[in-house]
Amino acid sequence: MLGSDKFSCFSDQHRARSPSPTDRKDKKNHTNKLRELALLIPVTMKTRDKKYTKKEILLRVLHYIQYLQRNIDMTKALLKLHSSNGKGRFVGPGLNPSAGQTQQQHSTPSSSQKPSLWSTSSKPRKKKFTRVSEHPSWPYNPRRSLALDQAENPNTIHPGLKEENEECATYPGVLSPSTYPTTEPSVSEGDGQGAQLVFLDMAQNIFAYDILSDHAVEVQGGEPNADIKVQRSFFLTRAQPCVSSCRQKLFLCTSSEADKEAPDSDPWLPVWTSEDSPNGSPLALGSSQINTWHVADYLNEILGVSSSLFSSPSKILPDHVLEDGTYFLTEGLLESSPATCEVESPQEKEVSSEGPTGPPNFQSSVSLDHCYLSLSENVKVLSNCGSSSESTDTESLWGQEEVRGVATYPRRTGVFSLAQPSVLQQANPEGLQTSSDEDRDYTWTPTGQSSGLPVASKKIKKVQASQGPVKPKDSRKACPGQVKKKCVNGFIMFCRMNRKQYIRACPGTASTAATKDLAQLWRGMTLEEKKPYCTKARRFSRQNNRIVKQENSSSEDDDGETPKPFYQLLAEKAQVSLGLTSLPTPNCQ
């Protein structure tokens, strides 16, 4: 009973937790609607392999809505600013607070702790951009700004803003999203046709003293500059990893370009405009600003990129590091100029200096670990070093004997340059050595670098050392001290000349089985049928310096009878003999 009660309770809880089909359908509909809403955003999301979660899509949509709300608030503020009669203006930082009560009638009251929007008006005047450090008495500000123009006097601050600064420093408040910016006109002591700078601060966690903390004064000799009546203050937020922390934007509005906005502004990057930029395009600096503010400093400040990336490496590295390679670090890296990538050792330099000098070959100057010589280069090396081998191709015995070219496939022999054959000759002064008589390939086995050779090559080397030096292939005389090999008899020549053809006639037959069948056929052959094979074997042995009996050799060599192949012998035996079953037949599998 207790077990059934527990199972029933568990099933009830599982039904309560599991969503119903209608809930699943509604949830799917909400997800589809959210994705459709994300597709409506002009700034498309980056494509990636993993799908975006609902939270990421929702945050993307909310960020875009925030961006639209900021633009709407800014437009309302600008419309309200330009629709005002312009009589009462707000005294911005750096102006004289004794201008009268009419200058403050349209300003934000001092009881408000969030002066988010304010503007200044001054005569257009070019000024060098200077950076001023933060005030030491104020706490650490995560939203540090770069002051491009300085205020004239730090003490002449609007009283209302000063009170707000004190209140916010004591009780720092947070701007709520529902707080809308208010417009505050500025005073124009001249003709009033100057540009108006509107600072729109939309960050949610900004103190009131944050704007004032970025103001400083440019003092020359302890006294302010008397020629400057009003100076504009430019604030540019530093690019942060989090996009939401960069909310302060700087907009330049003139009386003639009040309704023009930047059409190509990015909603996720800090934007500022200049007077020379067309249609208020972002990230545009005038010629005077470019002359006074270096591009490398700008990129270092905004993007956080080191200034060393914008200068030549030869200006940064010391001379003892560069030595003679300044060309390769400046023009060689920044321009498409040919340069060698080979670092030669002192030994290689000595060898190359002895050889003929010529124009450098940049294609063949790269050192290789595995070097394979071509046929033409191999012939040169063979003619210089000298070697000999035996041709064991049995099929050439039926026709004319031809001399085949031998290709060289050397082992792993260290690093040397293809463009310097003298290095190759120096690495192997004793010349190339031969392998067994059945192998037609030469193996280059130098004596100085034999540590990396396999065991088989070492054994071959020992046998070759016991045989003594080897003469070239064309020489017919035996070398002194060389041990002659055994003579080739008629049966061996018969097998060499017929084994391959026997295997071709019966595909799949093993070589040992073919040899056994040929041996059975050899036993049934007469002396006259065996004589051509014995003559061919004796001639081959004399040509290759093997042990040959001298008796009756001249008369046998003059006989030019051609040997009969195995299939002709089988046909003749089949016609003569009555018992065909006793004759050996090819065992085709």
From Swiss-Prot:
Keyword field: DNA-binding, Meiosis, Nucleus, Transcription, Transcription regulation
Quote the subcellular location field of this record: Nucleus
Q: Where is this region: Helix-loop-helix motif?
A: 28-68
By its UniProt entry, which PROSITE patterns does this protein fall under? BHLH (PS50888), HMG_BOX_2 (PS50118)
Query: Per the record, which residues fall in region Basic motif?
Result: 14-27
- Outline the segment boundaries, as ranges, of region: Disordered: 1-31, 89-191, 342-363, 422-457, 544-566
Q: Tell me the protein's name.
A: Meiosis initiator protein
Whose protein is this, by species?
Mus musculus (Mouse)
